[in-house]
């Protein structure tokens, strides 16, 4: 058993290092270079090893007797299974249409080959909507008509930011537009099974996290959850009064940002508590207990924020994960802090001094996610 745990820890750390390195490789050598890492057989095998060994540990320890813990770890396996299905069976591409033209083909991203759709897409109109009394775009809208080859059925609908067309297993989403506003670029995503399995994993994860927190029956956790939801509501109400980028005009914005920011705040407090713990050696155990108390909601909220963001990405861009640098560093942060819960498997986390030092170092992943990506690595999330 100890050997298996050491193998898991080794692979886990290697995957963290590879994820971090990939973001810098993307910065220096471009997205295609990073994609070579994310699609490499050894990268996929690393996740597979972690998933299989996790299942083996769950079986050997009969974790189903602790249902919330069992569901929590099982959800990660389901999410990884969904990601594998997406990788093996999914495809993405682009369609370019001028107003009044139609096509039944798209150019696949990975191979640049022309692929065929089971229906024809015609662009009736394209328009850019603006906020009242301003020239600031509020949305990009493509009015399209789709006609099926199988039964000649057709639909007419608008595709815009945060409004994806889902038809016959394909998802079409607003990607870009021509400078003269006479044409539109639509993204194409075909992934009927991978997304479904991944969403199932998200659902299991959410249920297990909530069960884990409420199982503690701690009023502070419940208050934190309530305060976070209130912040999300107020954030969304304020956002509706201010011009936003079209992609940000989503009700999920407030939930995503609020949970992430509350999580970062709690992790910052834990880091500060760690510094105090190193100087006050007589109280280091008590301070460690406080940090552990705060770590539960911090990681739970971070997980909720990440996966709400993934759902939002699926609605906005047609895909739930794009290996954007901020996504990757948020995942790294989640994994780094998640490791600290496993003190029974890794006894070092039971040592107050080690725990405090770990929490101090771990905050660097938060700093990198929140500031480093925006000011150094860039990516889709670098709005600031």
Region locations from a protein language model:
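Solvent-exposed, non-transmembrane regions of integral membrane proteins
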Residues: 1-384
């Amino acid at each position: 058993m100890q050997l298996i745990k050491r193998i898991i820890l080794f692979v886990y750390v290697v995957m963290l290092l590879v994820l971090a390195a990939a973001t810098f490789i993307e910065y220096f050598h471009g997205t295609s270079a990073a994609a070579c890492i994310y699609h490499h057989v050894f990268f996929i095998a690393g996740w597979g090893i972690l998933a299989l060994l996790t299942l083996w540990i769950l079986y050997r320890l009969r974790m189903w007797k602790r249902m919330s813990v069992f569901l929590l770890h099982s959800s990660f396996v389901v999410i990884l299974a969904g990601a594998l299905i997406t990788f093996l069976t999914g495809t993405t591409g682009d369609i370019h249409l001028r107003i009044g033209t139609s096509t039944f083909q798209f150019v696949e991203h990975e191979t640049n080959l022309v692929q065929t759709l089971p229906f024809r897409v015609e662009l009736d109109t394209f328009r850019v909507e603006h906020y009242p009394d301003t020239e600031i775009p509020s949305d990009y809208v493509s009015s399209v008509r789709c006609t099926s080859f199988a039964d000649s059925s057709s639909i007419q609908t608008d595709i815009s930011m945060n409004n994806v067309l889902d038809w016959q297993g394909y998802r079409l989403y607003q990607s870009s537009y021509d400078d003269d506003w006479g044409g539109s670029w639509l993204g194409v995503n075909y992934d009927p099974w991978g997304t479904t399995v991944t969403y199932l994993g998200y659902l299991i994860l959410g249920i297990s996290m909530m069960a884990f927190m409420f199982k503690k029956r701690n009023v502070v956790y419940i208050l934190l959850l309530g305060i976070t939801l209130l912040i999300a509501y107020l954030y969304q109400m304020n956002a509706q009064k201010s011009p936003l980028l079209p992609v940000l005009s989503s009700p999920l914005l407030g939930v995503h940002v609020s949970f992430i920011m509350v999580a970062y705040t709690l992790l910052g407090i834990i880091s500060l508590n760690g510094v105090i713990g190193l100087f006050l050696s007589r109280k280091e155990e008590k301070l460690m207990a406080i940090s552990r108390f705060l770590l539960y909601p911090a990681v739970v909220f971070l997980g909720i924020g990440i996966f709400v963001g993934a759902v939002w990405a699926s609605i906005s861009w047609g895909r739930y994960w794009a290996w954007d640098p901020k996504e990757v560093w948020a995942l790294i942060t989640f994994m780094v802090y998640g490791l600290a819960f496993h003190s029974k498997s890794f006894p070092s986390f039971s040592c107050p001094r080690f725990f405090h030092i770990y929490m101090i170092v771990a905050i660097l992943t938060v700093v990198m996610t929140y500031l480093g990506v925006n000011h150094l690595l860039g990516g889709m999330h670098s709005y600031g």
